Amino acid sequence: RIEEARNFCNKLWNVARFIQDQVDIKNTEDSLQPTTAADHWILSKLQRLTDGVASDLNMYAFAEAYDKIYHFVWDDFADWYIESSKTTPNHGVLKFSLESILKICHPFAPFVTETIWQSLKWSTDLLITSSWPVIPKSDTSHYKQFEEIKAIVTESRQLTKTMGLQKPSLVHSSDLLESNQELVQRLAKVAQSQEQG
């Protein structure tokens, strides 16, 4: 558990560093405007996390709350959303998500989260005095779209690993994949994604 906690704190540091590198310090007032399916998906996931952790804390279910936070940060945010944002970064969603994560994590890792918060280029106050995050509702249709992309990418990765393929091509007949071609190529690690003729 100690090693897991240490790795989790390192992950938080790395995520914060990546987002700070992405965000333009001259424009720290990026508005929260989700534009991609991934943006809507992560905000929906964040809303569920916020509600779930708040409920767990009220019931003193600290282990359950920590597990929710751990899997969200490690899987949903770092593995999926951060990787997706490397294609089309949304500074507003990245900043808002990071701030919300730090607020939610603060009861479990107060010193680490406060230190990260103070290192943010746009931070002007103390994390301990900030309010619990309020997550805006997101588009459920976009959430489902990204879930579909995730499922296809996961299956593609598994097939690539099982068959020992090097930089395979993904042939499909999906309008969704066609409109998210660059994203799919990045996430699935394929040479190209092309529509089936």
Where are these regions (language model features)?
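Conserved short loop/turn motifs at secondary-structure junctions
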Residues: 1-2, 70-71, 87-91, 101, ...
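Conserved phosphate-binding loops in nucleotide/dinucleotide-binding enzymes
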Residues: 1-7, 52, 59, 63-64, ...
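Catalytic adenosine-cofactor/nucleotide-binding cores of aminoacyl-tRNA synthetases and other
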Residues: 1-35, 122, 161-167
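Core structural elements
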Residues: 7-20, 39-48, 66-85
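Short alpha-helical functional segments enriched in proximate histidine and acidic residues
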Residues: 19, 56, 72, 80, ...
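Acidic, turn-prone loop/beta-hairpin segments
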Residues: 25-54, 79-154
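C-terminal low-complexity, glycine/proline- and small-hydrophobic-enriched intrinsically disordered tails
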Residues: 123-197
